[in-house]
C-alpha cells in the first residue's frame, strides 16, 4: 500500500482475460518508464489470469469479488446488486489504502467496480478519483460504457467502438497498448535464435499457429490436417494447440518439422521465428501481430457479437492480412491459400510492411502520459 503521498498512486483495472490484463500491464510498464517513483497497483479477482500475470510482472495485486454480468435473465441477475455492492465496497478499501490518484480501466468485470467506487453516484466516495477508460475492442462492453460516462478521458483502439467522453462524438483513438518487449521486437535479429529455440530449420518458411491461451479446435484440425501438404511444400510449423487439447499430426519423414506445443510462453521468439500466422482476432492478438509486422490469416470466433472480425478489419483493409470464417477454415484452405502465401517472399514482405503500418507501437506510452496528466491535474487541485 502507498502511504507516501509524495508519490503518484495509479490503479489499473483490467482483470479476467489476457485481453484485459495485457493492455493494463503495458500501460503500467510505460508509467514506470516515465516516472519510476509512481506506484502502480492492479485490481483483479482470484479466478482471473491476473493472479499469475500480474505478480510475474512485479506489480502488487489487490483482489476484489468478481461481478460477472449475466448475458441472459437468470437467477444470477437477481444476485447482481448485492455482488456489485460487495465488490465496490472492497474496491473502495483498496483505493483508500493506496491513496489512489487515478483509476485506469480496460473493461471487464474488474473495471466496473473500480469505476463505481471512484466516480460519483449512489456509491460515490468522499474523495472523487478521476477515471481514464481504454476500450480495446471494436465494440465496447457494458463496463466501459458505464465508465465512459464519468471518465476524465476516454481512449479507444479504433473509431466507432461505442464509447466517448462527454461532449465528444467518439473516443480518442490511440490503438491498443502493447508491451515494450513486443513493440521493440527486431524479428530479423532474433530469427536464428528463435528458430533454434523451437527446433525449427534456419531457412525456409515457418507458419505460426495459435488460438489464444486455450487454443482453438478448428485451427488445430485444419492446420494439422494439412501437415502433409505443408511438409511437401517445405513449410515448417510452430503450433500452440492449447494446454487442454491434443494434436494428432501425421508423420512426414524427411520434411520440415511440425512442432506442436501446448502453450507459447515466449511469444517474442514465436513471432521472430515465423513468416506468417494463423490465429484468432482478439483485440490484443491483432495489436501484437500487426505491431511486429507479421502477415496474418485471422479466424474470428464464430460466436459473440462479431467483435473479433471488427478487430481485424483495419489491418486487413491496410493489406496486412486476410479474414477467413471459422467454418471456411479447412485443410484445403491451408493448402490452397496459405501455402502459396508462404512460398511468396515478395508478398510476405509487402503484407508485413502493411501490417506494421496499421499497428500502433506507441500506444502504451501515449496512454501512460494521459494517465499521468490526469493524475497531476487532480493532485494540483487538492
From Swiss-Prot:
<comment type="pathway">
    <text>Cell wall biogenesis; peptidoglycan biosynthesis.</text>
</comment>
<feature type="binding site">
    <location>
        <position position="308"/>
    </location>
    <ligand>
        <name>UDP-N-acetyl-alpha-D-glucosamine</name>
    </ligand>
</feature>
<dbReference type="GO" id="GO:0030259">
    <property type="term" value="P:lipid glycosylation"/>
</dbReference>
<comment type="function">
    <text>Cell wall formation. Catalyzes the transfer of a GlcNAc subunit on undecaprenyl-pyrophosphoryl-MurNAc-pentapeptide (lipid intermediate I) to form undecaprenyl-pyrophosphoryl-MurNAc-(pentapeptide)GlcNAc (lipid intermediate II).</text>
</comment>
<feature type="binding site">
    <location>
        <position position="137"/>
    </location>
    <ligand>
        <name>UDP-N-acetyl-alpha-D-glucosamine</name>
    </ligand>
</feature>
<dbReference type="GO" id="GO:0050511">
    <property type="term" value="F:undecaprenyldiphospho-muramoylpentapeptide beta-N-acetylglucosaminyltransferase activity"/>
</dbReference>
<dbReference type="InterPro" id="IPR004276">
    <property type="entry name" value="GlycoTrans_28_N"/>
</dbReference>
<keyword id="KW-0131">Cell cycle</keyword>
<dbReference type="GO" id="GO:0071555">
    <property type="term" value="P:cell wall organization"/>
</dbReference>
<keyword id="KW-1003">Cell membrane</keyword>
<dbReference type="GO" id="GO:0051301">
    <property type="term" value="P:cell division"/>
</dbReference>
<feature type="binding site">
    <location>
        <position position="213"/>
    </location>
    <ligand>
        <name>UDP-N-acetyl-alpha-D-glucosamine</name>
    </ligand>
</feature>
<keyword id="KW-0132">Cell division</keyword>
<dbReference type="GO" id="GO:0008360">
    <property type="term" value="P:regulation of cell shape"/>
</dbReference>
<dbReference type="GO" id="GO:0005886">
    <property type="term" value="C:plasma membrane"/>
</dbReference>
<dbReference type="Pfam" id="PF04101">
    <property type="entry name" value="Glyco_tran_28_C"/>
</dbReference>
<feature type="binding site">
    <location>
        <begin position="17"/>
        <end position="19"/>
    </location>
    <ligand>
        <name>UDP-N-acetyl-alpha-D-glucosamine</name>
    </ligand>
</feature>
<dbReference type="GO" id="GO:0051991">
    <property type="term" value="F:UDP-N-acetyl-D-glucosamine:N-acetylmuramoyl-L-alanyl-D-glutamyl-meso-2,6-diaminopimelyl-D-alanyl-D-alanine-diphosphoundecaprenol 4-beta-N-acetylglucosaminlytransferase activity"/>
</dbReference>
<keyword id="KW-0808">Transferase</keyword>
<comment type="similarity">
    <text>Belongs to the glycosyltransferase 28 family. MurG subfamily.</text>
</comment>
<keyword id="KW-0573">Peptidoglycan synthesis</keyword>
<dbReference type="Pfam" id="PF03033">
    <property type="entry name" value="Glyco_transf_28"/>
</dbReference>
<protein>
    <recommendedName>
        <fullName>UDP-N-acetylglucosamine--N-acetylmuramyl-(pentapeptide) pyrophosphoryl-undecaprenol N-acetylglucosamine transferase</fullName>
        <ecNumber>2.4.1.227</ecNumber>
    </recommendedName>
</protein>
<keyword id="KW-0328">Glycosyltransferase</keyword>
<keyword id="KW-0133">Cell shape</keyword>
<dbReference type="GO" id="GO:0005975">
    <property type="term" value="P:carbohydrate metabolic process"/>
</dbReference>
<dbReference type="InterPro" id="IPR006009">
    <property type="entry name" value="GlcNAc_MurG"/>
</dbReference>
<keyword id="KW-0472">Membrane</keyword>
<keyword id="KW-0961">Cell wall biogenesis/degradation</keyword>
<feature type="binding site">
    <location>
        <position position="179"/>
    </location>
    <ligand>
        <name>UDP-N-acetyl-alpha-D-glucosamine</name>
    </ligand>
</feature>
<dbReference type="GO" id="GO:0009252">
    <property type="term" value="P:peptidoglycan biosynthetic process"/>
</dbReference>
<dbReference type="InterPro" id="IPR007235">
    <property type="entry name" value="Glyco_trans_28_C"/>
</dbReference>
Amino acid at each position: 500500500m502507498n502511504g507516501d503521498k509524495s508519490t503518484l498512486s495509479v490503479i489499473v483495472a483490467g482483470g479476467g482475460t489476457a485481453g484485459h490484463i495485457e493492455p493494463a500491464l503495458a500501460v503500467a510498464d510505460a508509467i514506470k518508464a516515465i516516472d519510476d517513483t509512481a506506484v502502480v497497483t492492479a485490481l483483479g479477482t482470484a479466478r482471473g489470469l491476473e493472479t499469475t500475470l500480474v505478480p510475474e510482472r512485479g506489480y502488487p495485486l489487490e483482489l476484489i469479488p468478481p461481478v460477472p454480468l449475466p448475458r441472459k435473465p437468470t437467477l444470477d441477475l437477481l444476485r447482481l446488486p448485492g455482488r456489485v455492492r460487495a465488490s465496490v465496497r472492497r474496491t473502495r478499501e483498496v483505493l483508500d489504502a493506496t491513496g489512489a490518484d487515478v483509476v485506469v480501466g480496460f473493461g471487464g468485470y474488474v473495471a466496473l467496480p473500480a469505476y463505481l467506487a471512484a466516480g460519483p453516484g449512489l456509491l460515490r466516495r468522499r474523495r472523487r478519483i478521476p477515471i481514464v477508460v481504454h476500450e480495446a475492442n471494436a465494440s465496447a462492453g457494458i463496463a466501459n460504457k458505464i465508465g465512459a460516462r464519468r471518465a476524465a478521458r476516454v481512449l479507444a483502439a479504433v473509431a466507432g467502438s461505442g464509447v466517448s467522453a462527454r461532449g465528444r462524438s467518439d473516443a480518442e483513438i490511440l490503438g491498443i497498448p502493447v508491451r515494450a518487449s513486443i513493440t521493440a521486437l527486431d524479428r530479423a535479429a532474433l530469427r536464428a535464435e528463435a528458430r533454434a529455440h523451437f527446433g525449427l530449420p534456419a531457412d525456409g518458411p515457418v507458419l505460426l499457429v495459435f488460438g489464444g491461451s486455450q487454443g482453438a479446435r478448428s485451427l488445430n484440425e485444419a492446420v494439422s490436417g494439412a501437415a502433409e501438404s505443408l511438409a511437401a511444400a517445405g513449410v515448417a510449423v510452430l503450433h500452440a494447440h492449447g494446454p487442454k487439447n491434443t494434436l494428432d499430426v501425421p508423420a512426414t519423414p524427411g520434411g520440415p518439422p511440425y512442432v506442436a506445443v501446448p502453450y507459447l510462453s515466449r511469444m517474442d521468439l514465436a513471432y521472430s521465428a515465423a513468416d506468417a500466422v494463423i490465429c484468432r482476432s482478439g483485440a490484443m492478438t491483432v495489436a501484437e501481430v500487426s505491431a511486429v509486422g507479421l502477415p496474418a490469416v485471422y479466424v474470428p470466433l464464430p460466436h459473440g457479437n462479431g467483435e473479433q472480425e471488427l478487430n481485424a478489419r483495419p489491418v486487413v483493409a491496410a493489406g496486412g492480412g486476410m479474414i477467413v470464417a471459422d467454418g471456411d477454415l479447412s485443410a484445403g484452405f491451408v493448402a490452397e491459400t496459405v501455402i502459396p502465401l508462404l512460398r511468396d517472399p515478395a508478398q510476405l514482405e509487402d503484407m508485413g510492411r502493411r501490417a506494421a503500418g496499421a499497428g500502433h507501437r506507441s500506444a502504451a506510452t501515449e496512454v501512460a502520459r494521459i494517465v499521468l496528466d490526469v493524475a497531476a491535474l487532480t493532485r494540483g487541485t487538492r
